[in-house]
From Swiss-Prot:
Its main location: periplasm. InterPro entries: Cyt_c-like_dom, Cyt_c-like_dom_sf. The keyword rRNA-binding does not apply. GO terms for cellular component: periplasmic space. It is found in: Periplasm. One of its GO terms (molecular function) is electron transfer activity. This is Cytochrome c-553.
Amino acid sequence: MKRVLLLSSLCAALSFGLAVSGVAADGAALYKSCIGCHGADGSKAAMGSAKPVKGQGAEELYKKMKGYADGSYGGERKAMMTNAVKKYSDEELKALADYMSKL
């Protein structure tokens, strides 16, 4: 009986984990943490000098965020963006880039 209960619990836990990981990243929800610097509609020049995200394509935005994450992109003040994007998965960065490209 204990073995059946243990096996059932394990299966339930694995099923829950698969269901959670299968949820698509929500670019709009992720963008909420970007509004302070980039503005609600993406038209704000972050730190007074960055190109607004509004009007940029998804692929361009994705490449820039990946570059910030790995240190290959950005100017003197890239530390803030590097720290901001490092926490996101590749799927989340793509969802975020897709959302921003539609602002």
